[in-house]
Amino acid sequence: MPGRSSSNSGSTGFISFSGVESALSSLKNFQACINSGMDTASSVALDLVESQTEVSSEYSMDKAMVEFATLDRQLNHYVKAVQSTINHVKEERPEKIPDLKLLVEKKFLALQSKNSDADFQNNEKFVQFKQQLKELKKQCGLQADREADGTEGVDEDIIVTQSQTNFTCPITKEEMKKPVKNKVCGHTYEEDAIVRMIESRQKRKKKAYCPQIGCSHTDIRKSDLIQDEALRRAIENHNKKRHRHSE
């Protein structure tokens, strides 16, 4: 447009996106609220399993996690729709101001139309929640999980002995207090030990390999590590039982 500068950041011709981009940034911050809600629901669900509270209460937390995961998907789709619209308009540089709201809504609905339950497998916190819930039930020896895993009637001492192997850090060779799981290979380590190992290797410009014997994963990164809340609780419960038996 004559007399208009298009060199300013966040604008295309006479169309300014600064306000939209600012609002988009604030919208992204809402992601932290969703993550916090998922962490709380996950923690409560694990508490319910640990205390063997009625299944209906646990189901409520599971339902809450589904709702959070759904909200997370909607937020990601909306952010993607806005960003896609902005990029498209910047590239096209139209003389006439388009209906941005309508364009965003069309892109958002197009993304939403492809929704499926399989999408939840891409939500890291939701997947982690389901895995830890299953693991904690197994560690607590709940009947339903024994039947599902085909371990009904198996000696509990054998199960405990097998579980204790998972309690030991492959680096320190000691029982873990703050276990973290590697998302890539699934092995667990003491948090401080594996972080020190990764940092030490990085200082020498080398990759950190998984210290678990037999594991072929040779590039562990801090971003691959997640808190293994189920294992931490299982270790604590095991120690409490051991302490009671020794009294």
From Swiss-Prot:
This is E3 SUMO-protein ligase NSE2. Its EC number is 2.3.2.-. Pathway: Protein modification; protein sumoylation. It is linked to Seckel syndrome 10: A form of Seckel syndrome, a rare autosomal recessive disorder characterized by proportionate dwarfism of prenatal onset associated with low birth weight, growth retardation, severe microcephaly with a bird-headed like appearance, and intellectual disability. The modification N-acetylmethionine is found at residue 1. Component of the SMC5-SMC6 complex which consists at least of SMC5, SMC6, NSMCE2, NSMCE1, NSMCE4A or EID3 and NSMCE3. Pfam families: zf-Nse. It comes from the Eukaryota. Zn(2+) binds at residues 185, 187, 210, 215. Changing residue 185 to A: Induces a strong decrease in SUMO ligase activity. GO terms for cellular component: chromosome, telomeric region; nuclear body; nucleoplasm; nucleus; PML body; Smc5-Smc6 complex. Keywords: Acetylation, Cell cycle, Cell division, Chromosome, DNA damage, DNA recombination, DNA repair, Dwarfism, Intellectual disability, Isopeptide bond, Metal-binding, Mitosis, Nucleus, Phosphoprotein, Telomere, Transferase, Ubl conjugation, Ubl conjugation pathway, Zinc, Zinc-finger. It is found in: Nucleus; Chromosome, Telomere; Nucleus, PML body. The modification Phosphoserine is found at residue 116. A zinc finger (SP-RING-type) spans 154-240. GO terms for biological process: cell division; cellular senescence; chromatin looping; double-strand break repair via homologous recombination; positive regulation of maintenance of mitotic sister chromatid cohesion; positive regulation of mitotic metaphase/anaphase transition; protein sumoylation; regulation of telomere maintenance. Belongs to the NSE2 family. The gene is NSMCE2. Changing residue 27 to F: In a breast cancer sample; somatic mutation. Changing residue 215 to A: Induces a strong decrease in SUMO ligase activity. There is a cross-link at residues 90, 107, 125, 130 (Glycyl lysine isopeptide (Lys-Gly) (interchain with G-Cter in SUMO2)). Disulfide bonds: none annotated. One of its GO terms (molecular function) is SUMO ligase activity.
